[in-house]
Amino acid sequence: MPITKQRTLDYMQQEWGTYVERFKCLPKEEQEKRVKRQGYESFQDMLAHILAWWEEGMGIIHAIAEGREFERKKYDFDIFNAEAVAKYKPWDEAEFMDHFEKTRQQMEADLRSMNEALFENRRVRSWLNGIVFEHAREHLVTLSRFLTLDMLVHEWSEYADRFQRLDSEKQREFLLKQGLDSFHDLLAHIIGWWEEGARIIMGILGSPGFTWIDPDVDQFNLMLTKKFASWSDDDLLKHFDVVRIALIEMVDELPDDAFMNKDIEGWLAADVVQHFDEHPIRT
C-alpha cells in the first residue's frame, strides 16, 4: 500500500480533520447507533481509543526520527484500549474534544516537519498504516468523499498487482480463506458489486422515488461468477480498471449532500471501503 508523506498528511487533514464534524452532523439517534455498532458506549470513548494509539505511535515515530532507542512492546490490545477509555472517561466533553483536535493538529505538524525518507522506514510505515490509514476504515462512522476516492485511487488500483506479488503458495492460501477457486472469481465478485452499487446510487440521484430490491448475496455472487466465467483474465482485469475509474468519476461528481444520504453512503462504504478489508491481500 502506498504510504507517502503527502498521503499521510492528507489523511490527517482531510479525513481525521473532518471526522468529528462529520459525525456531529448525524441525527442524535443515528450517532448513538453507529457508536454502538463500533462497540463503544460513547463517541468520546471511541475517540479516546483512537487518540491513545496516535500518542503511542507518534512516540515511537519520534524516537525513530531522532535515532533514539524505544521500548518494543508486546501489546495486549484489550488492556491497552480499556486503559485508554478509562483515562479519558472523567474528562468533560468539550475539554476532551479540544484535546483531541489539538493532538491531531500537533500530529499533523510533527509529520509535516519530518524528512520524506522517514516514511520509507518499515516500522514507521507499519505504525502509520495502523493508526492513520487502517483506523480510518476500522472506525468508519461517516463516509467522506476523501476516503472513498483515496481507496479507489490508491488501494484498489494496486489490488491485482498485490495478489500477483504473492508466491503461488500464498495465493492458494488467500483464495482458500476467501472460499474462492480463482482470483478471476474474486475480481468478478468485486466488479459486480461495484456496478450494482453504482446503478443504485445513480438511480437514487436521478429520481426521489427510485426503489430497488437488495439482491440475495449468495445468489448474486454465483450469478457474477457465471457472468464473467467466459472472460479472459486480461479482459476482466481491464474491465476491473474501467469500472474503478468510472467509480472515481462518479464519486468525484457527487453533490456534497449525497454523502448524507444513508443509502448512497451505505453502498459506497460497503463496496469501496468495507469490501477492501473483507478481501485483504497482505504482502
Annotated model-derived regions:
Residues W16, L26-E30, W156-F174:
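N-terminal first-folded block
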Residues M12, W16-Y19, G57, F100, ...:
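Hydrophobic alpha-helical core bundles mediating ligand binding, dimerization, or RNAP-core interactions
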Residues E32-I79, E116-S157, R172-Q219, E253-T283:
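Short, contiguous alpha-helical
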Residues M1-T18, S144-D161:
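Extreme N-terminal tail/first-helix region
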Residues N81-A117, Q219-D257:
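Acidic/histidine-rich alpha-helical segments that form the ligand environment
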Residues C25, H49, S113, R165, ...:
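Conserved catalytic core of Hanks-type protein kinase domains
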